[in-house]
């Protein structure tokens, strides 16, 4: 679409309104549009966390699944939600745009939650209640009942992936970075975006969990379905006020193109002088411009990828013909190399989210056996997650007000701890949390054995579990912001969208690894002496926690080696005399 030339300050040349005309600053975008988008994010967080954090009690108490099976169902659901964000981001950047992606996937999410609600209403979609006289022989959910449940959960996960991948980016599209006033408003937008995430989280682990446990699952899930439909209606009502940006394509396409081109040219010989490789200068000479690309110097690492930039004259490739699947610029190759350099750091972040997964599964099962009463009020098991959220918020507040100033004063570094330092601390706290959880479980188990199998609620207060929730919250505040900062800073300018994908994929893989670990442990410990028993009082859950603690500790040591090896992009380029262009960050919640 060609844009008419104009000198009006109110007309934006890089954004359109819903009718395809250049966007008018006075009629589109700004806070009115952003507020409607924030509604979607708050409800998405409320729904995903509200279902996930309390799902294990539904699976064990209503569907009569074992603890290990229930834990894997929850972690697979949450892992899929995060992994599908990659698909949602690809679809939004390449095909549909962010607006349509949000609208379509929010409708899919609403469908999934509606089916989940119906499964709690229709008696035939859940097994009968246990007979008090034969409680050890509860009838498990049938294949059809589980099929409906999984359909509901994974439709919800699919919808979550599309919404989560697009909502922060579409919100930022409502502000013009080239205009100082709107640029400052964008910063406040991301603050409010994070606020909405936390509001949704707190409502999920308190009000929504209480409704599910004390009023009824049909009401708890029904509220989620209604909230999604309401938020989607508000979102669609703002259509004529939104600003729309052109499709930018997925950065994964560039990665794939470089790999394919390098493979096609694998038999060609690299020139001794890298200046003979195809680069942005050749495109500038042929086409007159190469917007958005800052030429990067050649590096000696991963030289096999350099073959993507070899001109193959026999294949008909010249400087005037640019097919990215047969010939990539050296700058494109160097950007992909930078992604490859980040992969060891990326990989060592995964295990922290395996620790986090325990809070929504086995820790909830632990809390069911403890005395959770405060006076006449009993805290729902899943509401223990409020201490995790509290640890996260407290750490964020202290870090902003104390740690940043302290680092500036002691180390002359104005941004607080460096990204890799925060990631390392987060991993340390993750291992510590699992060690604490193992010690707490030992105490809980000794008390259970002392009082015999007939005592369902042990004479131990819920406060015993607070440390493990709190420590994970502290660790997550550090590692999440550290990962986000690291990926945003280190991703090449032309591939900033990869930062979101790299972050969310560690969450997804962490949840999936938890499922794999539980399955392996269940297989090797058997039914005679299980670590994760259906009745925790007959298991050895503390051994599983020790296993996770040791794995995360070893992972932490590996991370220290990789972080010592890693050189920040800014320093590496400064050593060859290149100053980075100003690269705006893309904050994002999770």
UniProtKB/Swiss-Prot annotation:
Mod. after translation = Acts as a high-affinity nitrate transporter when phosphorylated and as a low-affinity transporter when dephosphorylated. Forms homodimer when unphosphorylated and monomer when phosphorylated. Low nitrogen concentration in the medium stimulates phosphorylation. Phosphorylation also regulates the nitrate signaling.
Name where it mostly resides: membrane
Keyword Acetylation assigned to the entry: answer is no
InterPro entries found in the cross-reference section: MFS_trans_sf (IPR036259), POT_fam (IPR000109), PTR2_symporter_CS (IPR018456)
In which tissues has expression of this protein been reported? Answer: Expressed in the stele in lateral root primordia before emergence and in the tip of primary and emerged lateral roots. Detected in emerging and immature leaves, guard cells, flower buds, style, stigma, anthers and pollen grains. Not detected in the shoot apical meristem.
Query: How does inactivating the gene affect the organism?
Result: Altered development of nascent organs. Reduced stomatal opening and reduced transpiration rates in the light resulting in enhanced drought tolerance. Slower translocation of nitrate to the leaves.
Q: According to the UniProt record, what happens if one changes residue 356 to A?
A: Loss of the transporter activity
Residues the record lists as Phosphothreonine modifications: 101
User: What GO cellular component term, any one, is given?
Assistant: plasma membrane
Q: How does it assemble?
A: Monomer and homodimer. The dimer has the 2 monomers in the same orientation. Interacts with CIPK23.
Name the UniProt record assigns to this protein: Protein NRT1/ PTR FAMILY 6.3
Say which species the protein is native to.
Arabidopsis thaliana (Mouse-ear cress)
